[in-house]
Amino acid sequence: MTRRDIFNQIMTTNRPPIFSDRTSVEQVEEGTQLAPKFDDKGVIPCITQHAETREILMFAFMNEEALRLTIGTRLAHYWSRSRQKLWKKGETSGMTQEVQRILIDDDQDCIIIEVTLTTPDAGGDEASCHVGYRSCFYREISGSGDDLPDLKFIESEKAFDPNAVYGDTPNPTQL
């Protein structure tokens, strides 16, 4: 089945590409069939990395539908735990993530997607973080021993203005 066939299947039916059943450790670890292991909440962790710079951009979760759509459309889709809904990256901001490669770990319970980015519709540089930084990992934990750790900014400037990009959209960060 070609990528175009898979894409057409996704766009014309609600059936996902066939994920194999997990039948043996050997099949999962050494086989060539995709048999992802979703957790008890129906999600799998996903690390998103820039395809060219190798920079870690973000961490999110995918449910089965998000993984199916990501594979089929080559655009990153995630499951938003805070909003409890499917989330196509860039739907609000215009900052889509175009998938170049998808990796899965040895026991098929964690995904890495390598992406290229687009710039926000409202202007600014390419980024992945809703706070405005290029990466969601824009701070480093510093301190040692018995000291209370501090957070040190490793990205000094925001890539875009989140107010201009998101407007009145509710902030997904929860306390």
Model-predicted regions and their roles:
Residues 3, 7, 12-43, 51-52, ...:
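C-terminal binding/interaction regions
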